[in-house]
């Protein structure tokens, strides 16, 4: 007679005081070069593949969690949120309003622009990224034009593409098209008719989001041949309507199936703070472009930390919106349950402006998700400091400090303490059970959904055209069963319950964004790729709730480790609570502004 299955306690009956944090222990080989090629052959082998995936799942408790456990909750296939209380001190933008009008409204929520603070005379000021309003001022005052800035960008892209080692931030770049866009914007300024504050602002688009007439390859070598681009994705169309100029399609981890940014197809994007290290991924190119100064913002996708991880590693802002807050129509990954399109930016202010333009749920999501009204924080409200002072920040201390080096968590803790001492916020201890179950449920959810999307092409003979890293992931994802998927959705309901309970006592949850700073790029990974699930697990340690539960989250740079590598602090918010996150993030950014450092690979496109 077999061993009886493990039975989970109904989620409402779990005693939080009895929960003990357990640091995850992921078991998987680190592979590059020939060893990775051999491993992929074994994983795809009909004879050995099933055995190997079975061993990997057993070693990492996936089988025990999903096959040998009774989970009493019913599945949650899409995030389900209770009605939310209205946010304080916000300006309603209107989900269906013209993006130009929304951006104009959002502009009034920002502190007045003072050129003397941004363009100081005399001594060289500390390093600051140029903001969208700096470009707008420069265009309107005749300091420069979009066409001049476009030439600086073109020179920067060409310079870094020809460096040794190269810094391949873009997979598709057309200098003539960029000049054409910039010329049209320059004429609008000359005629006194700029469209919005975003007119003439250069933005990059991740290669899994449609931006006509560029192809969308997902950084593969073939996807543009089987899927044509006929028009802009909805988020891109909204930006274009505001006058945004598109640099091109940004590099990424192939099809978003990795978080380092490694890509043998087009070259691996390199971290502007240390070019021998990864940017993080999968939005590697967008993060590198913003961090290096080549654009103020970029649009990426985030299904497993893919906006927040590279933003943290590259020392910039990364906003992950609530699932369904942005319309995913026109993205390669628009059918899943964990992914969103979101901005990466040099500042919280710029993230807020870009978010104001791209936000707006699609009709189907309005019916099923019932989003709260779209709004942004009024940062010039007389009540702003009082609202900040009332914020309660949740911190699960044992989890918070489970990082590769305490430099990371201590730096994040210092930023939180500075916020509390400056505004009177309170830090509350919380407990979030079943974090390892959450990780497993996310892997199965995003993996199964990705495999479902790619399997027809995989079976149609495209298997060998994927990178070895992608093929490793797909071989594992293809081994997940319907039982695994349904069990994962039952876990999703449990994890949602725990977070909803936490949000009854706190307003935001704070963690380090990643459990490790930017890892080194192995030389052996450049041609054939790399599979390193242990490093990936460190990078993803704190980001998963944002995806499995669809919660909004933002990463803010708060300092550097002993090697000078950026450290990001993550804030996770209530459903539809982007405005509250942006308010707190703006305060933290201001408090930590002097800690930001100029990347070693940086191009000043406004003051060149």
From Swiss-Prot:
It catalyses: N-(9Z,12Z-octadecadienoyl)-ethanolamine + H2O = ethanolamine + (9Z,12Z)-octadecadienoate; N-hexadecanoylethanolamine + H2O = ethanolamine + hexadecanoate; N-dodecanoylethanolamine + H2O = dodecanoate + ethanolamine. Inhibited by methyl arachidonyl fluorophosphonate (MAFP). This is Fatty acid amide hydrolase. Keywords: Cell membrane, Endoplasmic reticulum, Hydrolase, Lipid degradation, Lipid metabolism, Membrane. It comes from the Eukaryota. It comes from Oryza sativa subsp. japonica. Pfam families: Amidase. One of its GO terms (biological process) is lipid catabolic process. InterPro entries: Amidase, Amidase_CS, Amidase_dom, AS_sf. Catalyzes the hydrolysis of bioactive endogenous fatty acid amides to their corresponding acids. The hydrolysis of endogenous amidated lipids terminates their participation as lipid mediators in various signaling systems. Converts a wide range of N-acylethanolamines (NAEs) to their corresponding free fatty acids and ethanolamine. Forms homodimers. It is an enzyme of class 3 (hydrolase). It is found in: Endoplasmic reticulum membrane; Cell membrane. Its EC number is 3.5.1.-. GO terms for molecular function: N-(long-chain-acyl)ethanolamine deacylase activity. Its main location: endoplasmic reticulum. Substrate binds at residues 303-306. The gene is FAAH.
């Amino acid at each position: 007679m077999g061993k009886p299955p493990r039975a989970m306690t109904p989620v409402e009956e779990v005693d939080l005081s009895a929960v003990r944090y357990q640091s995850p222990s992921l078991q998987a080989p680190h592979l590059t070069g020939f060893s990775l090629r051999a491993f992929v052959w074994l994983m795809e082998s009909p004879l050995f593949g099933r055995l190997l995936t079975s061993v990997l799942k057993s070693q990492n408790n996936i089988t025990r969690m999903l096959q040998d456990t009774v989970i009493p909750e019913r599945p949650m296939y899409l995030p389900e949120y209770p009605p939310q209380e209205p946010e304080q001190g916000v300006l309603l933008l209107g989900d269906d309003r013209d993006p130009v009008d929304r951006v104009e409204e959002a502009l009034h929520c920002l502190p007045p622009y003072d050129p003397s603070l941004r363009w100081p005379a005399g001594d060289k000021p500390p390093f600051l990224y140029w903001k969208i309003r700096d470009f707008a001022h420069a265009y309107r005052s005749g300091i420069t034009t979009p066409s001049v800035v476009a030439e600086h960008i073109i020179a920067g892209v060409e310079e870094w593409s020809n460096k040794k080692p190269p810094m391949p931030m873009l997979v598709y770049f057309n200098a003539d098209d960029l000049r054409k866009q910039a010329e049209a914007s320059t004429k609008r300024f000359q005629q006194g008719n700029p469209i919005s504050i975003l007119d003439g602002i250069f933005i990059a688009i991740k290669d899994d989001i449609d931006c006509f007439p560029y192809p969308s390859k997902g950084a593969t070598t073939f996807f543009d041949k089987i899927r044509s681009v006929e028009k802009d994705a909805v988020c891109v169309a909204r930006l274009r309507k505001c006058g945004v100029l598109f640099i091109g399609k940004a590099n990424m981890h192939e099809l978003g199936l990795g978080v380092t940014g490694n890509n043998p197809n087009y070259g691996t994007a390199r971290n502007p703070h240390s070019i021998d290290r990864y940017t993080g991924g999968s939005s590697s190119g967008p993060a590198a472009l913003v961090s290096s100064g080549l654009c103020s913002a970029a649009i990426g996708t985030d299904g497993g930390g893919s906006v927040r991880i590279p933003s943290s590693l590259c020392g910039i802002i990364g906003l992950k919106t609530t699932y369904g807050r942005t319309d995913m129509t026109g993205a390669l990954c628009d059918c899943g349950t964990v992914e969103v399109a979101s901005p990466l930016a040099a500042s919280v202010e710029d993230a807020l402006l870009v978010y104001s333009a791209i936000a707006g749920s699609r009709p189907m999501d309005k019916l099923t998700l019932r989003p709260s009204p779209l709004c942004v924080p009024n940062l010039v409200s007389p009540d702003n400091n009082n609202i900040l002072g009332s914020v309660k920040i949740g911190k699960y201390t044992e989890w918070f400090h489970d990082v590769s080096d305490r430099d990371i968590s201590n730096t994040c803790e210092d930023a939180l303490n500075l916020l509390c001492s400056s505004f009177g916020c309170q830090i509350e201890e919380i407990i979030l059970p079943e974090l390892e179950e959450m990780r497993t449920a996310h892997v199965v959810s995003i993996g199964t959904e990705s495999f479902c999307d790619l399997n027809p092409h995989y079976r149609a003979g495209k298997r060998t055209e994927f990178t070895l890293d992608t093929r490793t992931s797909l071989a594992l994802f293809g081994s997940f069963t319907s039982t695994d998927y349904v069990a994962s959705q039952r876990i999703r309901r449990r994890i949602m319950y725990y977070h909803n309970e936490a949000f009854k006592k706190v307003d935001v949850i704070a963690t380090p964004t990643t459990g490790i700073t930017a890892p080194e790029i192995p030389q052996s990974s450049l041609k054939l790729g790399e599979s390193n699930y242990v490093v990936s697990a460190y990078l993803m340690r704190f980001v998963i709730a944002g995806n499995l539960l669809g919660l909004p989250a933002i990463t803010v740079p708060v300092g550097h480790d002993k090697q000078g590598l950026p450290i990001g602090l993550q804030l996770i918010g209530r459903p539809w609570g982007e405005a509250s996150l942006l308010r707190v993030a703006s305060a933290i950014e201001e408090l930590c502004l002097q800690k930001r450092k100029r990347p070693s690979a940086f191009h000043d496109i406004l003051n060149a």
